[in-house]
Amino acid sequence: MRQKKRAAAVLLSAVMAFSAVSPAVPVWAASWQKNASGSYIGSDGSVLTGILSRGIDVSQWQQNINWSAVADDDIQFAMIGTRYNNAVDPYFDTNVRGAAAAGLRVGVYLYSYATTTAMAESDADFVLNLIKDYPISYPVVLDVEAQEMNGLTPSQIADIINAFCKKVETAGYYPMVYT
């Protein structure tokens, strides 16, 4: 089971890393369909290469989500926001439970304002405490794009990321980074 989770985390990380260096995907990505052979096709009928699965990133900004409709649209996973204005995202519980009930794999992310390793460890504690009773099957992600980090050196940012990821991995989850 642990190998399957690690493989899923590695796959998701690879997909997200590939996405980061790939050209921007047009808005019509929402209309992707699968052809008879199981490949995704664009709105113009061309086969899209490198697409392994579809997922969404949601938080309080999307408000009420029809998770059955999401699953019916060939979405296989959801990355759920955990925090908004230093409190639990008001839609976190509803989103995790709804996504899981619809059969989606669930991961979570935390938009971090950490500027020290102690703050990153506190962020990890916040997330780990929040998710302990939920069916998390995809990575626990640290989102490191806050303006507060702009003045930090690459070494300081790496230390922050490593502090968060170490705590998450020690707790039995697979850490990942959004940038």
Q: Which residues does each PLM region occupy?
A:
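Aromatic-lined carbohydrate-recognition surfaces of secreted/lumenal glycan-active proteins
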Residues: A171-T179
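N-terminal secretory signal peptides that target proteins for export/translocation
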Residues: M1-Q3
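Hydrophobic alpha-helix-in-membranes signature
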Residues: S22-V25, Y138, Y174
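Substrate-binding cleft of extracellular glycoside hydrolase catalytic domains
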Residues: N35-G42, S46-G172
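Sec-dependent N-terminal signal peptides
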Residues: K5-A20
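Sec-dependent signal peptide cleavage junction
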Residues: F18-W32
